Amino acid sequence: MRRKKISIVGAGNVGATCAHWIAAKELGDIVLLDVAEGVPQGKALDLMEAAPVEGFDCMITGTNDYRDTAGSDVAVITAGVARKPGMSRDDLVSINVKIVRQAAAEIARYSPDALIIVVTNPLDVMCYVAYKASGLPRGKVFGMSGILDGARFRTFVALELGISFEDVTTLVLGGHGDHMVPLVRYTYAGAIPVEKLIPADRLAELVQRTRQGGAEIVELLKTGSAYYAPGAAITQMLEAVLKDKKRILPCAAYLDGEYGHRDICAGVPTIVGAGGIERIIELELTAEEQAAFDRSVSAVRGVLKGLDI
């Protein structure tokens, strides 16, 4: 039986960590691509040499040539300049838009049936760029955002309550940036509404920490941005696709009227399976939640304005 083929564009910390998770879960063969000669080849070889120890069986290939990605089932775009202290995700747009545009076009050229998962920041803008550059149907190009943001909020809630991380569920909507919308109303600890367990003022602090979650790690690392949690979040999306799990996952999706917005990418709850985003779930938001979502989408539009797309 043919193994699934997963191509990762960008062999930096996020791409390499994602490859590690994919290999450990045996989701398929991996192609690790980067412009830096020797880097993807070295990381691929290093990871493959862990196979006899860890007991996974998959081929991992490093390359500088998009032709080696031909026939991919899924491609993940992580390539781009990483954040440094003091930078917002939006500060990366002028550099990363060129990288993502080329990557999406090359993926579509060599793997016209592939799904594309975008990870490069600013995420929602890059997801839109990739969608337009690829020419693929909207459900086949989507971004990793709410899973990571939700994981951060879940972590902070679990630590606050002293409970298992697994027992906290939540939903984060909107852009993957400072205006993201963690929905406290949809946050539960072991099926108990978290509003019953944590005072409102403390919950507001945890929401704000979630919005600044990426920046907090950037400030601590000083040389780059997060990669363990992003790698795990990407892998959860890949598993949903490759195993056709029909998972309900918050993803950056191209909106065509959903939640009152068109021609923009933003984080919304979706059903993810073999077809990519197979359905966008529209929730009835409160007036306050809708206003926050609208502000978040407006921030994404503001970054998109002026780009040649």
Curated annotation (Swiss-Prot):
Catalytic activity line of the entry: (S)-malate + NAD(+) = oxaloacetate + NADH + H(+)
Protein residues bound to NAD(+): G10, A11, G12, N13, V14, G15, D34, N96, V119, T120, N121
Keyword tRNA-binding carried by entry: no
Keywords, in A-Z order: NAD, Oxidoreductase, Tricarboxylic acid cycle
An annotated GO BP: tricarboxylic acid cycle
Highest taxon above the source species: Bacteria
RNA-binding recorded as keyword: no
SUPFAM superfamilies in the record: LDH C-terminal domain-like, NAD(P)-binding Rossmann-fold domains
Record-listed E.C. numbers: 1.1.1.37
Pfam families: Ldh_1_C, Ldh_1_N
Catalytic residues in the record: H176 (proton acceptor)
GO molecular-function terms, A-Z: L-lactate dehydrogenase activity; L-malate dehydrogenase (NAD+) activity
Database matches in HAMAP family: Malate_dehydrog_3
Known function: Catalyzes the reversible oxidation of malate to oxaloacetate.
Identification of the protein by name: Malate dehydrogenase
Record organism: Desulforudis audaxviator (strain MP104C)
